[in-house]
Amino acid sequence: MSEKVTVKVERNILHLPAIALRGLVVFPNNLLHFEVGRDKSIAAVEWAVRNKSEVFLIAQKDMKAEDPKAEEMYQYGVVAEIKQVMRVSDDLVRILVEGKFRAKRTELDTEGSFLLASVRPAPVRPIKAEEETEAEALLRNVKTSFDAVLSMNPRISKDVVFAVTSNNDPAFLCEYIPANLLFRFEDKQAVMEESTLIGRLRLLVERLHRERRMLEIDKEIAQKVDEAMDKNQRDYYLHEQMHMISQEPVSYTHLTLPTIA
């Protein structure tokens, strides 16, 4: 690549190669594998590896957009380190990244051979003194909702269960739980966009309640399907029995009648 880009810090602004993510949100301290296939994304990976640079990972709003413009991407993402790159084919690479810190883009150049972002570190505002009582109640609600989700989804890994049940740090839980439990990427991004810890706790409670309700609905649907299948199988079995009985000839050749006199 002949394009020259200088990664620098200017007035707390970082200039980094960026990768637009489809249906994926990476949080700080999140270690994640994903595949990169678009030319601009591969070019960003190659440049970052060659120059030992971090990258800015940002989700695009429309997953179908092949070449999204700046306005088609969210404001907040994560500055990440590329830990590993594996070439899958000529036009596909698989990378392992580790999220470092949350950042907000101030500019995004989409015209070059790869996306180039100007970003500012965006730490989440901690809980204020007057918010502590609400935060404590919300955190308790998060733990209760997690237990409810766990009871309906036993496939949650033991590592996730241990991390959530053994930790009471709201800042950690507000990033760890969305990264590992929430299904919809829009829900993950909503947490990423929220800049206050109390706001993140409120969002997390709301999203976990919805996740629990969705699991309840899934269970109800599965039960109804099972009941319908059982009924259909019983009806089919009875129908086949009646059909066989109606078709079976009755022989009186060797029938012995009882003596009555």
Regions found by a protein language model. Name each.
Residues M1-L255:
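N-terminal low-complexity, acidic/polar interaction/targeting segments
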Residues T256-A261:
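A short, hydrophobic C-terminal helix/tail in secreted or cell-surface proteins
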